[in-house]
Amino acid sequence: MIREPAVAGRFYPANPRELKLQIEQLLGEAVATPKLHALGCVVPHAGYKYSGHVAGAVFQRLELPKKYIILCPRHYREGQALAIMS
């Protein structure tokens, strides 16, 4: 199943080029520090204008592995308590 963007144009730009530019800007605003090897992290996922600077700072600081797992909450009561995307 490929999930279509649910909030494109509201929480982040709908245009892929504008989105890429905004993400690069958020990552570029982060203070340059040595990369950390972390076993996990908690990152906010609100609209980029609200929490993008925090997410950018976290991701800029991490040494990202080749494979990782993303855990996220449901925003609605419907659906399974736990799901795995393919």
Predicted features along the sequence, with ranges:
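Active-site histidine-anchored catalytic micro-motif
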Residues: 1-86
